[in-house]
Amino acid sequence: MKTFALKKVLRKIRSVSTFWIAEQTLQHLEAIRTYELGIVLDMLPPRGRVLEIGAGTGWQARALENRGYDVSAIDIASSNYGANRVWSVTEYDGKNIPFDDNTFSIIFSSNTLEHIPYISEFQKEIHRVLKPNGVALHVLPSSSWCLWTNITYLLKWWTIPTAHGESAKNSLTEIYYFSRWWWVRLFRETGWKIVAQDSNRLFYTGASIMDSNLNISMRNKLSCVLGSSCNIFVLSSSDEADSQV
């Protein structure tokens, strides 16, 4: 009898959690990235030639182009968003950036670096194509995002998710690998100077709590209590970028 009652309670909890933890839509993802892009633009030089790494559908590249930047975009052929592209995205092997040395004044990525398994080696490629006085800006999922994704995933599917990125063996140790401190150490060890840091000031998870039913304004407020879902880093390989950011 007790076992039956417990199963009934668990089914009820799962039913409720499935309602609140919805499937993520592209429209919701675009709303989040649009808000984040507003923060990014405040941290970038006002003009320049931009390379977006991991461009997905290409709509962030398009948005940057519409704001006066000269934008090129790259992504791997197996990108989940390849079928929904709205902008010209060059496919590459994920290791070698298909551009000449000193081509770009700005390198931009959003929720991309964590998916690169040879992340330290890849920094050499970013250094190579970046002009000496250029900046790199990366938006990266945070420890808070990882923690709350684990919790919401558990509530919805009754299991812990696998690691989201490439550095950690599982989603529990990934909480550390997504920390601000881990990225700061990696960037410094690979020849970068950290010019500025910020957060995206939004709360969301990989399990998509309420999707677009929880608006951006409320997600902004929740981030003050539950933590921001992404960290933002502006990097340079020379002191000359200080006066531009």
Regions found by a protein language model. Give the residues of each.
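Helix-loop segment at the mouth of the active site in Rossmann-fold oxidoreductases
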Residues: I97-F99, I116
